[in-house]
């Protein structure tokens, strides 16, 4: 059975419950063995001593950014030791993390990559009826466009296909979204489809992967929702995030591959 608990600060969680009017008991634990799921009770493990009394709600805080990273790092360490079987994260304030001095760790994905020594990672957003992997996430739009390169596409699509294969017994079919309007219109609106994306798709097909595209971004997600594809590879943050959140915001999750 699932035995959930929170890694974080008990006082800040109690304050949040008060602010939101939620009635729930907070129980501090000092060891995982003490986790005892009960209705109306949240078990909290505090890995650090942190005084949140001076924190102003709604303002970016370097101290809070530091604590958020430390809590997540502790969760990852527990998972690496096999003491827990999964980690679920809440949104992290990237500005606070940056203010705390973690300039390379923009979000959870970067922290996971650092702690696991993974050179290749990617983000996948999932909601019932739609899965969207992302070639890039935490890059400016200009940087994201420059990142659309054949070798990167091949590696990220292979990673996506391999992860999907672990979740299902069937061979996944992945569609690649185009970067430019109308898929570039034969090069008139951009040449990334011709010079980078299509060659990457062709290479993967020769390797045996069921990868197709590029297809215009204004239709590929609709086709995936209709069941034509198992997943879509979006080429930058908002291209994929908007599709997922418009389709089903409330039931969407993010997974790091």
Model feature map: region roles:
Residues 125-147, 151-154:
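Ligand-binding beta-strand-loop-alpha-helix segment within the catalytic cores
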Residues 97, 117, 137-140, 146, ...:
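A broad detector of the eukaryotic-type serine/threonine protein kinase catalytic domain
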Residues 43-44, 121-123, 132, 252-254:
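Conserved beta-strand scaffold positions in the cores of enzyme catalytic domains, especially
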Residues 110-112:
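A conserved active-site-flanking secondary-structure segment within enzyme catalytic domains
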Residues 1-108, 151-235, 239-253:
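Contiguous, glycine/small-aliphatic-enriched amphipathic segments in soluble metabolic enzymes
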């Amino acid at each position: 059975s699932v035995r959930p608990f929170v890694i974080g600060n008990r006082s800040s969680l109690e304050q949040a419950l008060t602010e939101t009017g939620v009635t729930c008991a907070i129980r501090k634990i000092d060891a995982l063995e003490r986790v005892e799921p009960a209705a109306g009770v949240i078990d909290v493990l505090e890995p650090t001593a942190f005084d949140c009394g001076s924190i102003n709600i709604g303002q970016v805080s370097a101290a809070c950014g530091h604590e958020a990273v430390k809590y997540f790092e502790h969760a990852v360490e527990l998972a690496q030791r096999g003491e827990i079987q999964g980690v679920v994260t809440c949104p992290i304030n990237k500005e606070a993390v940056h203010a705390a001095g973690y300039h390379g760790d923009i979000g959870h994905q970067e922290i996971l990559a650092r702690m696991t020594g993974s050179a290749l990672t990617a983000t996948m957003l999932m909601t019932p009826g739609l899965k969207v992997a992302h070639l890039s996430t935490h890059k400016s739009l200009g940087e994201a466009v420059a990142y659309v390169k054949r070798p990167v596409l091949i590696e990220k699509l292979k990673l996506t296909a391999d992860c999907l294969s672990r979740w299902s017994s069937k061979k996944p079919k992945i569609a690649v979204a185009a970067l430019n309007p109308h898929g570039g219109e034969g090069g008139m609106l951009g040449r990334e489809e011709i010079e980078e994306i299509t060659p990457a798709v062709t290479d993967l097909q020769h390797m045996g992967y069921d990868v197709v595209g590029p297809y215009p971004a204004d239709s590929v997600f609709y086709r995936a929702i209709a069941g034509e594809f198992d997943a879509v590879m979006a080429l930058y943050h908002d291209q994929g995030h908007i599709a997922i959140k418009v389709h089903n915001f409330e039931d969407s999750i993010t997974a790091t591959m």
